[in-house]
Amino acid sequence: MGPKDSAKCLHRGPQPSHWAAGDGPTQERCGPRSLGSPVLGLDTCRAWDHVDGQILGQLRPLTEEEEEEGAGATLSRGPAFPGMGSEELRLASFYDWPLTAEVPPELLAAAGFFHTGHQDKVRCFFCYGGLQSWKRGDDPWTEHAKWFPSCQFLLRSKGRDFVHSVQETHSQLLGSWDPWEEPEDAAPVAPSVPASGYPELPTPRREVQSESAQEPGGVSPAEAQRAWWVLEPPGARDVEAQLRRLQEERTCKVCLDRAVSIVFVPCGHLVCAECAPGLQLCPICRAPVRSRVRTFLS
């Protein structure tokens, strides 16, 4: 913006200055008030990520390569979380879905999403894209295509024409949006605090590529969107920490030794094959275990 280290969010207006080491624009900006706060039809924080700034998706047209991938009858890439590849298991993960949630779990599970255990946050089992702040009338397939158009599960299930239609509709909305118009409720928001008590899921890092140039006379809405998603490539320490966290997540929480291979229904938590038979209650959430399903994590 100019003076000192002040910054301006293109959707929520002026933000606090005096940045400290470790401060992140996403944490400073996307607090509880901003979740699902529409600005001229654009939900700025619908696509969510962990507090470490992992990239989850971007609103952009499909590339020719992605179109070719989606046209095939088979999936050339494996799912990010194969343990939730079954629609039945995804639906079972909604056992603690908030009663106030506006979208039925059946629609979300059919669209590839499973519940993370946090509020109304869901993730796609294939592209690992995350969405939250659902409102009455939201269509999971449409939101999937809006935020994560290159998901191959989406392309195989709904087809390229559907994804193109959704992208074109929302591109028109972006084209009529003035990026410098400040909303009335542009007051600074407090940094968000993640909920605890539910095991973190593996988070693949994704590097976003800039695809469209700035429009003459100002910053285009597409440029503004990319400004929130771009992340520097992870360093060696980040990769090492991620691998260590992934190893811990795949270790049985009962014996703390063997790898998990059994998923409990309906809660969706994982334990090893040796510990599973003797458990009637999930050791993580204490929910009754109705059935057990063997799963293979790649």
From Swiss-Prot:
GO terms for biological process: apoptotic process; lens development in camera-type eye; negative regulation of apoptotic process; negative regulation of tumor necrosis factor-mediated signaling pathway; positive regulation of JNK cascade; positive regulation of protein ubiquitination; protein ubiquitination; regulation of apoptotic process. Keywords: Apoptosis, Cytoplasm, Golgi apparatus, Metal-binding, Nucleus, Protease inhibitor, Thiol protease inhibitor, Transferase, Ubl conjugation, Ubl conjugation pathway, Zinc, Zinc-finger. Zn(2+) binds at residues 124, 127, 144, 151. Autoubiquitinated and undergoes proteasome-mediated degradation. The truncated protein (tLivin) not only loses its anti-apoptotic effect but also acquires a pro-apoptotic effect. PROSITE patterns: BIR_REPEAT_1 (PS01282), BIR_REPEAT_2 (PS50143), ZF_RING_1 (PS00518), ZF_RING_2 (PS50089). Changing residue 124 to A: Abolishes inhibition of caspases and anti-apoptotic activity. One of its GO terms (cellular component) is nucleoplasm. Apoptotic regulator capable of exerting proapoptotic and anti-apoptotic activities and plays crucial roles in apoptosis, cell proliferation, and cell cycle control. Its anti-apoptotic activity is mediated through the inhibition of CASP3, CASP7 and CASP9, as well as by its E3 ubiquitin-protein ligase activity. As it is a weak caspase inhibitor, its anti-apoptotic activity is thought to be due to its ability to ubiquitinate DIABLO/SMAC targeting it for degradation thereby promoting cell survival. PANTHER family: BACULOVIRAL IAP REPEAT-CONTAINING PROTEIN 7, INHIBITOR OF APOPTOSIS. The RING domain is essential for autoubiquitination. Belongs to the IAP family. This is Baculoviral IAP repeat-containing protein 7. The gene is BIRC7.
